Amino acid sequence: MIRLIKLLTVFLLFNLLCVGQKELYVSTSFHEPANEGLRFIVSKDGYHWDSIPGVWLKPEVGKQKVLRDPSIIQSPDGTFHLVWTCSWKDDYGFGYANSKDLIHWSEEQFIPVMKNEPSTVNVWAPEVYYDTKKAEFVVVWASCVPNRFPNGLEDANNNHRLYYITTKDFKTISKTKLLYDPGFSCIDATIVKRSESDYVMVFKDNSRPKRNLKVAFSKAPEGPYSKASNSFTESFTEGPTVERVGDEYLIYFDEYQKFSFGAIKTKDFIHFQNISNQISIPHGHKHGTIFKASESLIQNLKNTYEAHQKQKKDTSSNAISKMK
């Protein structure tokens, strides 16, 4: 009987731990005009999303000090690493910070990845990926270096290509290299690992009049990547982020002329089905990166926000009382 009780106790404890470790889908976000800071939305099923109230990191670096296109990855030690667009133009880098709990953040850094290209117009939409094989981060972004490539459908100041750096600690940074030149202006790239030697890059064809999403394939995150596919979204879509739900990949994107989100599902990045009518995202949120986090971590975010609001209310009430 004692042995049975011990076994039941172990079983119950194991189940309690499993419940406590339940993961949710979370996405970084921001609100226009992008000067407030980092926000989050959360989902239990990957389709229907709710806002997590609060602004969790106020942008302090870059010429314009904005926080757009926030991209996040969790490294094996549990640390969350965040990169973002910190300037619209006339700047040479992106913002970076890290956190263990999404509440308390390191000092923000400005990483000047295009400092050796003084004519660079911008550094847009950095996306961070962790290469488990090499134990290093890969950050890809879009920059326009005027007259570096044939203009095609875009003028010299809007002719972007994709670049990347690698780093193990965001202190020592590799030399900036060209990641992808598909023969047209492209931005907003995100890398998806399907297996150890099978990678997909989803990105925006930023040339007129298309402004839509395409994919390319590679055996390594740093490329080389294949010729761009045909587009799989309508025009005026950007900011893709990809999450696996069951045996399918969901590709979320910003339909910026409609002020809404769309979504596509696929199993192979060749055949696509539009599921925009099956998703829901609170109004006002803009594109970020989907990741997974424990239910307890997200609850801690909510509790922290509520405690902060209560403190503000109590402080305000005390101030009013003193005025009477």
Q: Language-model segments: which ranges?
A:
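Generic short N-terminal amphipathic or hydrophobic helices
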Residues: 1-4, 319
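Sec-dependent N-terminal signal peptides
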Residues: 4-16
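Carbohydrate-active catalytic/glycan-binding domains of CAZyme proteins
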Residues: 19-324
